[in-house]
From Swiss-Prot:
Gene3D superfamilies: Farnesyl Diphosphate Synthase. Signal peptide: none annotated. This is Squalene synthase LSS. The gene is LSS. It comes from the Eukaryota. NADP(+) binds at R48, R73, R214, K314, R316. InterPro entries: Isoprenoid_synthase_dom_sf, Squ/phyt_synthse, Squal_synth-like, Squalene/phytoene_synthase_CS, Trans_IPPS_euk-type, Trans_IPPS_HH. It comes from Botryococcus braunii. Its EC number is 2.5.1.21. SUPFAM superfamilies: Terpenoid synthases.
Length: 462
């Protein structure tokens, strides 16, 4: 009942939700190869949202990135397992990149689906060893750097913002570097990405910091003793103990610290947009853009929100689906980021106007707005060229809408009515007077809604 109420409150999310259901169905169709089948089943278990975007990648990239993700999730499982003593964990993190070449290596650690990933790790190894040498080298190199970085931070706290940036570089910035190398190595992406490691690093930090901000309560309540990544340089300005933010009596300081953390994460947004503006493969673009827009949406939701210290804060499924289906091009991504930035600016000038960091928050948001506005202006000429092309996306969307409307007329047996309204003498031919039945009517309505929604996103029928 709750989900139905959500849909009724946000009817514009219905079509994206239906599209996401279709995408979700296809993620469950795994390859027949036992090794690849295991990898894609595990991918669905450890990250449904990531499974959806990986399945949309070009074939050249799909399997290497799936394996890349699982290798790094396994490494992350070792890092996160607080039951592993450091004398075992540290050498393992530093040597983990070598385990991917050992067909027999596995271990028991982690929790939930990660237990199966670690126990059946040879299945991942088998697929990895079948990859071309180029992807294998990239995965090995990034795993080596990440493992060494994680080992560096196991015995020490994240004290400064510089420490925070460095840890997030190891945990996620290196992922961006590896993805760029895989994409360029496949021949699908712009070689200039290899010269823009700073931008790919910002992509990773934007995602990682969003997760760290959002997961405060889950992380602080972890047993045994939790590892926290909020830098003391920030939280030390608002409390003597990071755990104090769980106490409702400390809500004011907690929210101020939260806003400070969100503001820090926002500095990566403009650079993430600059990275994505360099991409040329549409499927790889979607793969990169969807997590970034979800991260910005989550940061916006967390900003000035005391619920972060009380429970789960996440985007509605319909809202997530709408975001995932709207960012199909750079102009669409600019518009979405600009809308979110505008919303946050309004809140900074309203509900959060007394926040001690509001001036810096506004500065970061204005930087994002500037990149979006500049990008949209520069895309006007290319959009006009695209509109003049007979087979542009706009043309196809409108064509599908017209065909869908025709299908609706036929499926609902409306042709006799149109025949009479057109003042055509005589009855319509028998072939035009039969209804196709409920299944066809449902499909026809879905086609019209989907095509109509895409036409609306692209600026209407004009």
């Amino acid at each position: 009942m709750g989900k139905l109420q959500e849909v009724l409150k946000h009817p514009d999310e219905l079509v994206p939700l239906m599209q996401m259901l279709v995408s979700d169905y296809y993620t469950k169709i795994v390859p027949r190869d036992p090794g690849l089948g295991f990898c894609y089943r595990m991918l669905n278990k450890v990250s449904r949202s990531f499974a959806i975007v990986i399945q949309q990648l070009p074939e050249l990239l799909r399997d290497p990135i799936c394996v890349f993700y699982l290798v790094l999730r396994a490494l992350d499982t070792v890092e996160d397992d607080m039951a592993l003593p450091n004398d075992i964990k540290l050498p393992l993190l530093r040597a983990f990149h070598k385990k991917i070449y050992d067909r027999k290596w596995s271990m028991k650690c982690g929790y939930g689906p990660y237990v199966q990933l670690m126990e059946e790790y040879p299945m991942v190894t088998g697929v990895f060893l079948k990859l071309d040498p180029g992807p294998r080298e990239v995965i090995t190199e990034i795993c080596r750097k990440m493992g060494a970085g994680m080992a560096e931070f196991i015995p020490k706290e994240v004290l400064t913002v510089k420490d925070y940036d460095q840890y997030c570089h190891y945990a996620a910035g290196l992922v961006g570097e590896g993805l760029s190398k895989l994409a360029v190595g496949s021949g699908l992406e712009n070689p200039v990405l290899l010269q823009k490691e700073d931008l790919s690093n910002h992509m990773g930090l934007f995602l990682q910091k969003t997760n760290i901000v959002r997961d405060y309560l889950e992380d602080i309540n972890e047993e045994p003793a939790p590892r926290m990544f909020w830098p003391k340089e920030i939280w030390g300005k608002y409390t003597k103990d990071l755990a104090d933010f769980k106490d409702p009596a400390n809500e004011k300081g907690a929210v101020q610290c939260l806003n400070h953390m969100v503001t820090d994460a926002l500095r990566h947004g403009e650079h993430a947009l600059k990275y994505m503006a360099l991409l040329r493969d549409p499927q790889y673009f979607n793969f990169c853009a969807i997590p970034q827009v979800m991260a910005f949406g989550t940061l916006s939701l967390c900003y000035n929100n005391p619920q972060v210290f009380k429970g789960v804060v996440k985007l509605r499924k319909g809202e997530s689906a709408k975001l995932m289906t709207t960012v199909k091009s750079m102009p669409a991504l600019y518009r979405t980021f600009l809308r979110m930035a505008d919303d946050m600016v309004a809140r900074c000038k309203g509900e959060a106007r007394q926040d001690p960091n509001v001036a810096t928050t506004l500065k970061r948001l204005q930087a994002i707005q500037a990149v979006c506005k500049t990008g949209l202006r520069s895309s006007i000429k290319s959009r006009k060229k695209q509109a003049a092309t007979p087979l542009s996306d706009d043309f196809i969307s409108k064509l599908v809408l017209v065909l869908g409307l025709g299908y609706c007329v036929y499926a609902f047996n409306l042709l006799p009515l149109l025949w009479k309204s057109a003042l055509i003498p005589g009855p319509p031919p028998p072939a035009l007077t039969s209804s196709l039945g409920l299944p066809h009517q449902i499909i026809a309505v879905f086609c019209v809604l989907t095509a109509g929604y895409q036409v609306f996103l692209r600026g209407g029928l004009a």
